[in-house]
Amino acid sequence: MKVRSSLKSLKSRHRDCKIVRRKGRVYVINKTDPRFKAKQG
């Protein structure tokens, strides 16, 4: 899992990437390729 201050560029790395909010944090999740996971902060 990568930690970045901005997730906008990480969302465009793969077409299945989605941005979700969980417990006040912003995550990028990817079901088909989990190595694209990222967290904002």
UniProtKB/Swiss-Prot annotation:
A Pfam short name: Ribosomal_L36
Molecular functions (GO terms): structural constituent of ribosome
This protein's UniProt keywords: Ribonucleoprotein, Ribosomal protein
GO BP, sorted A to Z: translation
One GO term describing the cellular component: ribonucleoprotein complex
UniProt cross-references to InterPro entries, sorted A to Z: Ribosomal_bL36, Ribosomal_bL36_sp, Ribosomal_L36_bact
Family: Belongs to the bacterial ribosomal protein bL36 family.
NCBIfam families linked: PRK00831.1 (NF002021), rpmJ_bact (TIGR01022)
Annotated protein name in UniProt: Large ribosomal subunit protein bL36
Organism: Hyphomonas neptunium (strain ATCC 15444)
Lineage: Bacteria, Pseudomonadati, Pseudomonadota, Alphaproteobacteria, Hyphomonadales
Gene: rpmJ
